[in-house]
């Protein structure tokens, strides 16, 4: 837990900064949904999604390359994760970040119907997969379980939302 908390602090700090981009457009997206036609909404959504992918993709690559050197410098070599664990942490960061545009539009436009059971399914799947994978892959298995549960539920369900 102590090792992960260092990575969680750093990844969470980057996530908070990038999340402000989408927090800033939430009201405008709500107004867009109330005043514009479906074509314009889709165009703005695709632009926001593209920007989100670039921002979170660039940040994920930077985190992958810079997390271990920073943790070693700040906390010491004994607090390092293997590169494979850092990779899956960065993949989780990227996947969750690329969902921000969809979540912003969903929240602003009230499109909650499609994912009403998603949280329950994702939590159950995360628990089962993490328990199964931790036996073979230790810490990496827990993060792989989280990644797989996100891919198998959130990404799939959020693609059903018609923006």
Residue ranges and their predicted role:
Residues 8-11, 15, 19-23, 65, ...:
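Short runs within selected transmembrane alpha-helices of multi-pass transporters and secretion channels
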Residues 55-59, 87:
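Alpha-helical transmembrane segments of integral membrane proteins
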Residues 7, 11-49, 53, 103-108:
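Helix-loop junctions and terminal segments of transmembrane helices
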Residues 24, 48, 52, 61-65, ...:
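Short helix-kink/termination motifs in transmembrane helices of multi-pass secondary transporters
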Residues 58-77, 132-136:
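Short membrane-interface helical motifs at transmembrane helix boundaries
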Residues 1-13, 28-32, 68-78:
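Helix-terminus/linker motif at the lipid-water interface of multi-pass membrane proteins
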Residues 42-46, 79-82, 86:
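Membrane-interface helix-boundary signature
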Residues 37, 78, 110-114:
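Conserved short cytoplasmic inter-helical helices of the MFS fold
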């Amino acid at each position: 837990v102590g090792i992960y908390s260092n990575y969680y602090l750093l990844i969470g700090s980057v996530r908070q900064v990038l999340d402000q981009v989408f927090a800033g457009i939430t009201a405008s997206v709500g107004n867009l949904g109330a005043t514009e036609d479906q074509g314009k909404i889709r165009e703005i959504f695709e632009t926001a999604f593209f920007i989100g992918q670039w921002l979170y993709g660039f940040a994920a690559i930077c985190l992958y390359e810079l997390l271990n050197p920073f943790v070693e410098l700040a906390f010491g070599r004994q607090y390092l994760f293997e590169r494979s664990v850092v990779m899956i942490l960065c993949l989780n960061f990227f996947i969750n970040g690329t969902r921000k545009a969809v979540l912003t539009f969903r929240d602003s436009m009230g499109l909650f119907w499609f994912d009403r059971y998603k949280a329950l399914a994702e939590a159950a799947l995360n628990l089962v997969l993490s328990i199964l994978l931790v036996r073979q892959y230790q810490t990496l298995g827990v993060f792989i379980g989280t990644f797989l549960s996100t891919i198998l539920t959130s990404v799939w369900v959020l693609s059903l939302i018609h923006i």
